[in-house]
Amino acid sequence: MARELKEVQGIIFKRQKYKEADLLAKIMTKQDGIITLIVKGALRPKSQLSAATLNFSMGTYVIYTSGHGLSNLRTYKEVKQFDGLYRDLTKNAYTSFIFDLIDHAFVEYQPLGKYYDLAVFALKKIDAGVDNEMITQIVQMKMLSAFGVEPELRHCVICGKERGVFDYSIKLGGIVCSDHFAKVNSRLHLTPKQTAVLRTIGLLPIERLGNIELNSETKKATRKAIDRIYRETIDLNLKTKKFLDEIKLF
């Protein structure tokens, strides 16, 4: 494919120094996927491109691309900054992990579709002050399908029962009802409420998810469950997750 100028709408989420005065910046877009951009001269003092490519800048960018490999950022049109993320280390850490997680589920230029909408949802909610932990758990549960390990949350994986008391089994890939608790050694021994939270945030569309308020004990239990699901099914080793976990200790 020949190189062409193209307008893309997206979110800058990662940048690093490239050569003396240039940057490499990653942008997440809905139709064109994740693109690595060369931003020439961005490290020079008066560069307008530097501010437009700060992490978590969302806007319209004009790029020179062939649809594979590195593309070049030529200019930008409208860019929105999320100031709340710059002023708050914790918000920044949660958002960085979310975008890193999505980044690892796709190859470059692979369309993101609904997962881009998920990224925008998380970015806006965290910037607005909605519970960082719950937004992150929502994203983690919904991203399992992107990694090819979507759990069965609608009904018991053994008998198909949709109502009742449930627990979660990583080995079986979803929820199991109380009729089978004695036979399923791999269940996580979550409370009915904790399992219900996983089902709710995993199944409901993001536009129907309001502010989910949970006590710290429930959030801690669901976080441990989700982390274990990821560890035993995907085994990602993300630096952003390690940093986030370290922040939570303080």
Swiss-Prot record:
One Pfam family in the UniProt entry: RecO_C
One GO CC annotation = bacterial nucleoid
* Any Gene Ontology biological process: double-strand break repair
Query: Which family is it part of?
Result: Belongs to the RecO family.
Q: Which PANTHER family match?
A: DNA REPAIR PROTEIN RECO
Q: What NCBIfam families does UniProt report for this protein, alphabetically? A: reco
What is the official name of this protein in its record? DNA repair protein RecO
Q: Which gene encodes it?
A: recO
